[in-house]
Amino acid sequence: MISKSTIEQVFETARVEEVIGDFVQLKKSGSNFKGLSPFSDERSPSFMVSPVKQIWKDFSSGKGGNAVTFIMEHEHFTYPEAIKYLAKKYMLT
């Protein structure tokens, strides 16, 4: 079982732009980042990441969320698996 403090540390530490940047090539666009959707085959970037709000939105598929939900969607992980993945990435365990 994952401790509540580990979950809190993951949400405090994981930067959405760093997590997504491991899978998607992001380009700075004002205060946000944009890139091609990892969930669809597209030529024009419709995938946006907001470091300020710590959220992402894929306008081609309608999906969006935070660093944890991105890992869940992209890697087909459960919530506990995504938390464990991010805890390991940020050396929180």
Predicted regions and their residues:
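N-terminal structured subdomain of primase-like DNA metabolism proteins
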Residues: 1-93
